């Protein structure tokens, strides 16, 4: 009951940090059915392209042993080793391709789902992995029921397919008892192909469904409560590095927003290279000029550059520029102490427009 209530309280989507932490610990969505489909596909490729020739060679080898037993004397240990080595080599030549295919397709299916990464946490011993209580929850929980349903589905499908194939080839199956080894292997391969094709389609369907369900279940398990979101936010904002990064980002955004306001300015008051203050005055908007941008050094040069591109008058008055830079702030009206000096500059702007764009 407590576990259900805990899940119900997890109403928030997992944060990037929660997902990143889970990934670092090896907690990633992984569908075993995709691997099962890849293995089935590997076996089908083996049966179609390798098994026929391999089985024929194997049958011929066994045929020689059974039809010409006198050629294989077992008088000494050396004779026995020679016979066993012959059979083992023939068997190895037959099964080696399927092992290679299974490994390649198995690794490929894992990489398809998640890129490989070393995770020490997964190989460290933990009590909950051998705990009976934890095992009981895994078996009888939602995940356990889903796994049971998938296993039951595969057993039913394989059983039905095997019965139908053998029933369809009932007489051919009976005739195998009286056939030569080559015919027996050929018939078995034909039946095996039919079985694997149907199983391949079944596992493909199951793999697609399970792939989406596994990712959905993994995402749901990572969901967070509102309190967890608040705690994580406090923790991240409390980190000095994160705070510094946030302040830097905020300054960058404010600077970009301020620079974008320069074309709206009425005039620029500047110290030749160190300070620049952009003022906007429209009688219908405010009773006094408003500071739309200000900066020093490189920012001041940028303000002047934009102003000159937009035909905004630039007045070089070092004492006034320094004094205003120290006492005004962006998006606020200028203090009354500057009214007279700024009013004279605005009057010069109105008198000179549009002929004069820069006054020294």
From Swiss-Prot:
Membrane-topology descriptor: Multi-pass membrane protein
Domain of life: Bacteria
GO cellular component: plasma membrane
Chain positions covered by the region annotation Disordered: 1-22
UniProt cross-references to SUPFAM superfamilies, sorted A to Z: EscU C-terminal domain-like
Disulfide bond sites: none
GO biological process: bacterial-type flagellum assembly; protein secretion
Pfam family, one: Bac_export_2
Biased composition (Basic and acidic residues): 7-22
Record's keyword annotation contains Phosphoprotein: no
Entry keyword set: Bacterial flagellum biogenesis, Bacterial flagellum protein export, Cell inner membrane, Cell membrane, Membrane, Protein transport, Transmembrane, Transmembrane helix, Transport
Keyword ATP-binding: no
InterPro entries: FlhB, T3SS_substrate_exporter, T3SS_substrate_exporter_C
Localization annotation: Cell inner membrane
Gene3D superfamilies: 6.10.250.2080, secretion proteins EscU (3.40.1690.10)
TM helices/strands, residue ranges: 36-56, 92-112, 152-172, 194-214
Function comment: Required for formation of the rod structure in the basal body of the flagellar apparatus. Together with FliI and FliH, may constitute the export apparatus of flagellin.
Protein family membership: Belongs to the type III secretion exporter family.
Name of the featured protein: Flagellar biosynthetic protein FlhB
Species per Swiss-Prot/TrEMBL record: Rhizobium meliloti (strain 1021)
């Amino acid at each position: 009951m407590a576990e259900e209530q805990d899940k119900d309280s997890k109403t928030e989507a997992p944060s990037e940090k929660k997902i990143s932490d889970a990934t670092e610990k090896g907690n990633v969505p992984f569908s075993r059915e995709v691997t099962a489909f890849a293995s089935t596909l590997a076996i089908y490729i083996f049966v179609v392209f390798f098994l026929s020739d391999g089985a024929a060679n194997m049958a011929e080898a066994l045929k020689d042993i059974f039809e010409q037993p006198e050629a294989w004397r077992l008088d000494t240990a050396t004779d026995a080793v020679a016979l066993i080595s012959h059979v083992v080599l023939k068997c190895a030549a037959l099964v080696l391709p399927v092992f290679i295919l299974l490994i390649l397709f198995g690794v490929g299916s894992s990489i398809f789902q998640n890129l490989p990464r070393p995770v020490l946490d997964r190989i460290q011993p933990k009590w909950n992995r051998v705990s009976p209580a934890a095992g009981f929850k895994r078996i009888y929980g939602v995940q356990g029921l889903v796994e049971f349903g998938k296993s039951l589905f595969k057993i039913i499908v394989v059983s039905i397919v095997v019965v139908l194939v053998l029933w369809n080839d009932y007489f051919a199956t009976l005739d195998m008892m009286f056939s030569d080894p080559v015919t027996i292997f050929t018939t078995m391969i034909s039946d095996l192909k039919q079985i694997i094709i149907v199983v391949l389609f079944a596992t493909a369907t199951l793999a697609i469904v399970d792939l989406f369900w596994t990712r959905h279940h993994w995402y749901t398990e990572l969901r967070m409560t509102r309190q967890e979101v608040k705690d994580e936010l406090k923790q991240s904002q409390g980190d000095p590095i994160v705070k510094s990064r946030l302040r830097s980002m905020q300054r960058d955004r404010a600077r970009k927003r301020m620079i974008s306001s320069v074309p709206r300015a009425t005039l620029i008051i500047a110290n030749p290279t160190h300070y620049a203050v952009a003022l906007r005055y429209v009688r219908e908007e405010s009773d006094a000029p408003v500071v739309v941008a200000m900066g020093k050094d490189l920012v001041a040069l940028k303000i002047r550059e934009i102003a000159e591109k937009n035909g905004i008058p630039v007045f070089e008055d070092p004492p006034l520029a320094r004094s205003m830079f120290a006492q005004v702030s962006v998006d606020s009206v200028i203090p009354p102490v500057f009214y007279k000096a700024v009013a004279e500059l605005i009057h010069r702007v109105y008198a000179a427009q549009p002929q004069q764009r820069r006054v020294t």
